[in-house]
Every structure is written in structure tokens, then in C-alpha cells.
């Protein structure tokens, strides 16, 4: 989907895209009402029902679902497909625990939005246009619309001590 969107955006034309989901969680497909069943998804394309969604960009790279950095961002790619098939969302948690055992890299950033400036170290950040991320509903907020021109942002600060570390883990659980 991402490569298709990138190609269409480079054409600088509004062209409808048909999408048949093939992932484990299929958050984006669920958000726009596409069934997980491939023949049913294909039929929805044939029927021609259109959904408009916002497209974000970073340095000529486009996204419609999520752009993220930091801890756990490689989990969906690193998780074994057979494990995903048998355990579903739990497979991601198993992989996340493996990654948790490695050191968390921190990213020093200055973030500006509206009249607010935040400068700190972060272990995770994402810009999302989705009602759920990795099957977890509400992570990007509860008032999410895919075509409102607004992307939701989530930042998780780097824990500076053991108490903050435990609070971070509890918030992620």
C-alpha cells in the first residue's frame, strides 16, 4: 500500500486506489471499512465505494497510516509470520519483549505545535492517521478522523530513572 501511495502521489493526480489487506492486524483496512476476507475486499473495490483519507509526508516519503521512530517500531517486521498466524496480536507482544531486553535508544528532539515547545529525549514517537495501531485501539486518541487534515502525534519520553522506567512500562502495558 505504501509504495502504491508513493507512486500515485508522485504523479500529482488524485487516482483511486483499490486495497486488499494481507496483514495480521489490518488496522488501516478496518478503519476504512475493508473486510479482512480477500474476496470480499476485492468485491468492495469492484463495487466502487470510495473513501477519502489524508496523506502525510516526510522528506518526499508518503504515508497514510503511521510514521514512527524508536522502540518497538521494528516489531511488526521482525515478528515471525508463522507466529503471527498462530498467535495474532500476541505474537507482536512476544517480539516486543525480545526487543525490550535490548537497550532503548534515545532521540533528542524539539517538538513545536500550536504555541507549545517541548525539548526532551524520547524513546518513541509517531504521527498517525488511524483509530488503532498494531491492533491497539485508542493509542493515537479517541477523536480520530481519517480525512480531517489532522494527524495525531504520540511521544514517549526516555525514562530518566527507575521510577519513570516502571511508569513507562505500565503505561505501555
Regions found by a protein language model. Name each.
Residues 47-48, 96-107, 147-173:
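Catalytic phosphate-donor-binding core of small-molecule kinases
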Residues 2-127:
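Catalytic core of DAGKc-family lipid kinases
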Residues 1-2, 134:
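Short glycine-rich, flexible loops that bind phosphorylated cofactors or substrates
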Residues 73-75, 119-121, 132-136, 161-165:
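Short acidic/glycine-rich loop or secondary-structure boundary segments that cap or lie
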Amino acid at each position: 500500500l505504501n509504495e502504491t501511495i508513493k507512486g500515485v502521489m508522485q504523479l500529482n493526480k488524485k487516482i483511486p486506489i483499490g486495497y486488499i489487506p494481507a496483514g495480521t492486524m489490518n488496522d488501516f483496512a478496518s478503519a476504512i471499512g475493508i473486510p479482512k476476507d480477500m474476496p470480499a475486499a476485492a468485491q468492495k473495490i469492484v463495487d466502487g465505494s470510495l473513501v477519502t483519507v489524508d496523506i502525510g509526508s516526510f522528506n518526499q516519503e508518503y504515508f497514510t497510516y503511521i510514521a514512527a521512530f524508536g522502540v518497538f517500531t521494528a516489531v511488526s517486521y521482525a515478528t515471525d509470520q508463522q507466529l503471527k498466524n498462530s498467535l495474532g496480536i500476541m505474537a507482536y507482544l512476544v517480539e516486543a519483549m525480545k526487543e525490550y531486553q535490548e537497550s532503548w535508544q534515545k532521540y533528542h528532539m524539539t517538538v513545536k505545535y500550536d504555541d507549545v515547545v517541548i525539548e526532551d529525549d524520547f524513546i518513541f514517537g509517531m504521527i498517525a492517521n488511524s483509530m488503532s495501531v498494531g491492533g491497539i485501539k485508542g493509542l493515537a486518541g479517541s477523536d480520530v478522523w481519517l480525512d480531517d487534515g489532522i494527524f495525531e502525534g504520540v511521544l514517549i519520553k526516555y525514562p530518566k530513572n527507575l521510577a519513570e522506567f516502571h511508569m513507562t512500562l505500565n503505561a505501555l502495558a
